[in-house]
Structures are given as C-alpha cells and as structure tokens.
Design a protein with these regions (language model features):
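Short acidic-glycine-tyrosine-enriched beta hairpin
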Residues: 11-13, 64, 71, 78-96
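Hydrophobic small-molecule pocket/channel-lining residues, especially in calycin-type beta-barrels
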Residues: 51, 59, 72, 122, ...
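A contiguous, mid-protein "functional segment" used to position or interact
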Residues: 104-148
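Conserved short histidine dyad/triad with adjacent acidic residue
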Residues: 29-32, 43-58
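Ligand-binding loop in jelly-roll beta-barrel domains
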Residues: 36, 73, 93-118
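Well-ordered beta-strand scaffold positions
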Residues: 25, 79-81, 104
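Short, charged/polar surface micro-motifs in flexible loops or helix N-caps
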Residues: 35-38, 48-51, 64, 71-73, ...
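A short, N-terminal "cap"/entry segment at the start of jelly-roll beta-barrel domains
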Residues: 1-40, 133-160
Length: 160
C-alpha cells in the first residue's frame, strides 16, 4: 500500500518554509501538522552559543531532538547529557526539559508528536526579513503566557 501525501508535505520537504525568530533563535517550520493530519510536525532550530529556552513541560506532545550540527546539552527530567551531530534524544510529554547550545552554532531538527504546538511557535514569532544575525526583540512573558493555550508550562530558568 502506498500513501499519497498532500502537496503541502512535498512543498515543505523542499525547504520552502521561511525562517523566523523565536525566543532569540532562528526557526523554520518544515512540516506542519496540517500536512500530516495531526500526526507530527517538524521544525528546524538554528541557535548560537548559550541559546537556551526556559525549563518547560509539554502536556500534549512528545519532543524528539535530532542534532544536525554543533554540540547541545539537554536536560530531561533529572538527566543531563550532551549530544552532537547524528545523535537523537526524546523529551516525553509531562517531563520537564530544556537545552543549551555549547558550540558556536548548532542546528537541530525537532519533531513534535502529535502536532499542534508548532502554531505556538509561528504565532509568537518575529519575521526574519534581513538575516544580519541579530535576533528580533521578543517579550518572554507574553510568549510564556501564550504557551499555556498549547499546554506548554515554564517550570524553571534556562540551563546554564
């Protein structure tokens, strides 16, 4: 049996999605939940040294990180571990997690299952019109508050 994917998937897999700023990092929505009938969404994060989101919990989805370039330290529950290119880790729903970029730059693909949380990223982002490497200003409190509608709860500061 073969599965025919709708055109948005084909378009997304060609990298046609425009990057945007979110919490100081560059993000691209590669595959939306709409393209997978809600099964998964895939985003690409490109960050610089020290970039770290607050420690947080997702109520609704598991998060799978796949490091493409660079070195990233992940915190998942009580575990702390370093990943490099080609390595993968899981942040299960309901478990506090975060990361911090250790190398000069890092890039990772993040899969959310099921999808839905990608809308939080998109609706709370800033356009990346001219990429001079300077992130657009952002309001952390507003982004954190908006996350509650998507089942994302901040439970601590970013890791150091």
């Amino acid at each position: 049996m073969t599965t025919a994917f709708p055109p948005p998937v084909q378009s997304a897999l060609r990298g046609s999605q425009q990057p945007f700023w979110f919490l100081g990092g560059r993000v691209r929505l590669l595959v939306s939940g709409a393209a997978t009938t809600g099964a998964v969404s895939v985003l690409e994060f490109s960050d610089t040294r020290g970039q770290a989101p607050p420690l947080h919990v997702h109520d609704r989805e598991d998060e799978i990180w796949s490091v493409v370039d660079g070195s990233i330290t992940f915190v998942v529950g009580d575990d702390v571990f370093d990943l490099g290119p080609g390595e993968v880790a899981l942040g299960p729903r309901g478990t506090a997690h975060s990361y911090v970029v250790r190398s000069a730059t890092a890039r990772m693909l993040v899969t959310y299952a099921p999808s839905g949380v990608e809308e939080w990223f998109v609706t709370n982002s800033s356009p990346l019109e001219e990429d001079d490497g300077t992130p657009a200003p952002f309001d952390v409190a507003a982004i954190v508050s908006a996350g509650l509608r998507f089942g994302v709860h901040v439970v601590g500061p970013p890791p150091a």
